[in-house]
Amino acid sequence: MRKTKRRPVSVGEMLKVEFLEPMGITSKALAEAMGVHRNTVSNLINGGVLTAPVAIKLAAALGNTPEFWLNIQHAVDLWDTRNRYQEEAKFVKPLFVSLEQSART
């Protein structure tokens, strides 16, 4: 399991820095292209959670795939959850020895 110290880039950060700003696209123009309210795009840019239906529309508007966007969201969700529950996980009793542990012994 790979653990990173820094939180992965969010969908909103990726959208703003790699797509909207370099391409000169406003959040209003993107919302219109996607057929969603501009608050939907604004919420994403400001750290809101991406849903599958919005990922499909976002991908269609920007010419990439829903998986691209959902993978970014998944990485953030997993990082947040792992960091929130890492102390609790220490008390879980493994049912099986992992391959990684068995290689060390």
Curated annotation (Swiss-Prot):
The keyword Manganese does not apply. It comes from the Bacteria. Induction: Induced by amino acid starvation. Induced by the protein synthesis inhibitors chloramphenicol, kanamycin and to a lesser extent by spectinomycin. PROSITE patterns: HTH_CROC1. Keywords: DNA-binding, Toxin-antitoxin system, Transcription, Transcription regulation. Pfam families: HTH_3. Residues 27-46 bind DNA. The keyword Zinc does not apply. HigB-1/HigA-1 has been shown to stabilize plasmids very efficiently in E.coli. Antitoxin component of a type II toxin-antitoxin (TA) system that counteracts the effect of the HigB-1 toxin. Binds to its own promoter and regulates transcription of the higB-1/higA-1 operon. This is Antitoxin HigA-1. It comes from Vibrio cholerae serotype O1 (strain ATCC 39315 / El Tor Inaba N16961). The gene is higA-1.
